[in-house]
Amino acid sequence: MKKEINFLGKRVRRVFMILSLLFVIIGMYFFFTKGLNYSIDFQSGSVIYYKLSSPLNSNQIANLRDIARSFYSKSTIQTGSNGKEVWIRTKFLEENELKRLTPEVEKVIVKYEGREITTIEPTISRELREKAILAAVLAIIVMLVYITVRFRFDFAISAIINEAFVLLATISIFAISQWEVSPSFIAAILTLLGYAINDNIIVFDRIRENSKKYPKEDFTIIANRSINQTLARTLYTVITTLLAITPLLIWGGVVLRPFILAIYLGIIIGTYSTIYIASAILCEWRELQK
Amino acid sequence: MNIRPEIKTAFIVIILGIAIWILLTFPFRYGLDIRGGIRVTLQCQKTEGVEITDDAVRRTIEVIRNRIDQLGVTEPSIYKEGSDKIVVELPGIKDPERALEIIGQTALLEFKDETGKTILTGSALKNAKVEFDQVGQPMVRVEMNPEGAKIFADFTSKNVGKQVFIVLDGKVISNPVIKEPITEGTGVITGRFTIDEAQKLAILLRAGALPVPVKVIENRTIDPTLGKDTMESAYRAGVIGAILVVLFMILVFRFLGLVADIALLIYVVLDLAALKLLNATLTLPGVAGIILSIGMAVDANCLIFARMKEEYAQRKTPMASLDAGFRNALRAIIDSNVTTILAALILFYFGTGPIRGFAVTLSLGVALSMFTQITITRTLLENLLSLPVFKKATKLLGL
């Protein structure tokens, strides 16, 4: 028999569980004090985006800032791709205000490859946010029911705590780093919740199978063996998924980058949490029952 | 299921044939983020005496659709969102400002007498078109329906010498004096119009007034060059990603990996064909979802093959380990994929625009990959593993 790695030893798993909890607590502290950096889709405001063929110099950027601030004093100018992309963010501008702002801006930015203007009123954003929360809650309930039916109730609870951890950990990372949260972020979060539960269920399936095969064996040993047995598959899938999306991160353009970044995080968090959240909780639970 | 391998093979070949045919004949429908255009969200405004009911919103959408049809936009999409919002998406439009003016204007036309009493509204009109007077000044000729014509004839015969006020959205656009009774049910609206203004007015009058006024609360103008650039680079990145996955599978699982790669290729063909068949709108996050699904599709194979390796260590024949590998891995694959599809369904139900597109591509990808990576891989392997070559050369199988 191949040598097994002891993932779920009592001390190791408790250290990791406490560290995970600490991370989420710090993340939530940031979430409640600093909040998330919502993209314009979640808040009211106007953004004018330009893609340029040659980068702007600092003089031009200062000019743009002055122009935008003459409309709204807290406007910001953000550049990307070495100055070849510009975002001008202001408060919500009415049609006629936008019609005055853009010609002024285009006195500075004379030539551009592409332009995108987005304006959103606050009512929309509230609805979007509420829908996102509702979708997350519903997804969790549906998974809880499905796993209880297919496995056992304690499996379902561990899996849901695992999902909650993945969600909170991702939000923590975005709260601490202040990366922008856009609508595709919601799609990404739901995908990575799917990825995490996928990974989780593959391991739980092995635990279910091994528990039937060796009903007398200590549960923690069974769980640890199951993780070891599925380790090869876990590794392969992490690699193939990363291979598929990494080119997109490199060459896929700015628009998709936050989405792919969130998927990356999800793969790492999901793989980790299957072991140190889902399986670890299940072990604690079973040891308590003894 | 005990279906003979030949029948399964024939079934797969037929499906693949249909998919390739669809792929070659049907076009892709790209979302606004790729094609460019405008996306406007309108909110219906409550006014005196008019409540925002479902019916009012529906009729408003109808009028907006009529107006857009006259603009000649290809594949516009107009739909209700929430209780009182209307989303209008116009792909590939050249003059977004003009379109916005035409969509958003209430265009309530009223004929009023000198006391300000309304005699007729725009709903009494049958047609409106642009004409020119002797000096080439544009004007709009309106044609009334029979009841309208009768009311107007009555009114004009009683009020010769008085003024009639033609009011659009509360603003007087002309106030001619009635010289003689107008009985034939046509009239002209003159004003100091430019040709463009006259054309716009004619469109608005033909399509009718909005039952409730609307306000633009979200307005996105997306330049087509941006989306096209991203699409092209995403396409290239997707191809590179797929090649990397294919190579990895061969490297790790040898011949088994190659078979999984063939199934993966079939998966991509089926997936794209299904998207075309469903006329799904392909957005940028949707494209990312397709690429992601290529990486995740082979997960089933990794599970099965990893299991086959384990089983082979105990059973020693490729066929027996194939059977046990599939049988044992299937449970885990189904349980994990069903949960993913459930999550995707919730996304679809609550999501909007691009997110819905993403949910469609995700769940379609999971369902199809289960078919290709399990059924097709198995059928191929059942046919191939009985070949004499594999009796001894198990190294080739990567077991």
UniProtKB/Swiss-Prot annotation, chain B:
One of its GO terms (biological process) is protein transport. GO terms for molecular function: protein-transporting ATPase activity. The chain crosses the membrane at residues 7-27, 239-259, 262-282, 286-306, 329-351, 357-381. It is a multi-pass membrane protein. The keyword Cell inner membrane applies. Pfam families: Sec_GG (PF07549), SecD_1st (PF21760), SecD_SecF_C (PF02355), SecDF_P1_head (PF22599). It is found in: Cell inner membrane. One of its GO terms (cellular component) is plasma membrane. It comes from the Bacteria. Its main location: membrane. Keywords: Cell inner membrane, Cell membrane, Membrane, Protein transport, Translocation, Transmembrane, Transmembrane helix, Transport. Forms a complex with SecF. Part of the essential Sec protein translocation apparatus which comprises SecA, SecYEG and auxiliary proteins SecDF. Other proteins may also be involved. PANTHER family: PROTEIN TRANSLOCASE SUBUNIT SECD, PROTEIN-EXPORT MEMBRANE PROTEIN SEC. Belongs to the SecD/SecF family. SecD subfamily. Part of the Sec protein translocase complex. Interacts with the SecYEG preprotein conducting channel. SecDF uses the proton motive force (PMF) to complete protein translocation after the ATP-dependent function of SecA. This is Protein translocase subunit SecD. It comes from Dictyoglomus turgidum (strain DSM 6724 / Z-1310).
